[in-house]
């Protein structure tokens, strides 16, 4: 983590997070599912408009990014209304564009064939559960820092969006893990937020990130 050599930097910790997933769905049985498979669910909810509201129909689509014990982590990708065209939409933690436990989900393989339909027992927000653990080597006490206390969830940079790409952003923080530098273990020394993982990404001013 240090810019120059020396034991002074041995206590530094670098933590990185990207938009790996949006939600964790507890489904019990994950048989037949694999990372990279699609997930669909009947769309529901009410969308406010100008002087009126409308009810969602059609279906939501996402992708499985991880499989745990009875759980799958998913990215929310799009909404396709009944008889309409698929539209890319970002996950909304407190809105209607998210998977929920009100109806089953169907896992779809890479050949667009449904391989499993299961009930969703519960849903949790992936980003809100991500933490960084620091350890003071002198006292052996651990401190937990929640990522959602450091920054908003990573998303898509304007540079990537203009090139029809998504989910390239990443946050990087440098932490005084054991307190040797600041005297306070767990102090965040640097925050580099909303960087891009894209090889050719640029800041709005034109320099590479």
Regions found by a protein language model. Give the residues of each.
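Surface-exposed assembly/interface segments
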Residues: 1-209
């Amino acid at each position: 983590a240090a810019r120059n050599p020396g034991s002074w930097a041995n206590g530094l910790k670098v933590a990185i997070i990207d938009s790996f997933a949006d939600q964790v769905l507890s489904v019990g049985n994950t048989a037949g599912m694999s990372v990279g498979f699609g997930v669909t669910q009947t769309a529901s909810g009410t969308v406010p408009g100008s002087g009126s509201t409308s009810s969602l129909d059609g279906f939501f689509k996402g992708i499985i990014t991880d499989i745990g014990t009875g759980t799958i982590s998913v990215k929310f990708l799009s909404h396709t209304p009944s008889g309409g065209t698929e539209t890319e939409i970002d996950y909304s933690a407190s809105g209607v564009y998210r998977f929920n436990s009100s109806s089953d989900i169907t896992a779809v393989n890479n050949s667009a064939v449904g391989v499993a339909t299961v009930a969703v027992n519960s849903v949790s927000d992936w980003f809100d559960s991500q933490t960084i653990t620091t350890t003071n080597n002198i006292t052996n006490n651990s401190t937990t820092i929640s990522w959602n206390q450091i920054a908003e969830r990573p998303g898509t940079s304007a540079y990537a969006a203009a090139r029809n790409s998504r989910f390239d952003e990443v946050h990087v923080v440098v932490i005084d893990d054991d307190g040797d530098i600041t005297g306070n273990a767990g102090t965040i020394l640097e925050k580099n937020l909303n960087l891009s993982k894209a090889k050719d990404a640029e800041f709005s001013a034109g320099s590479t990130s």
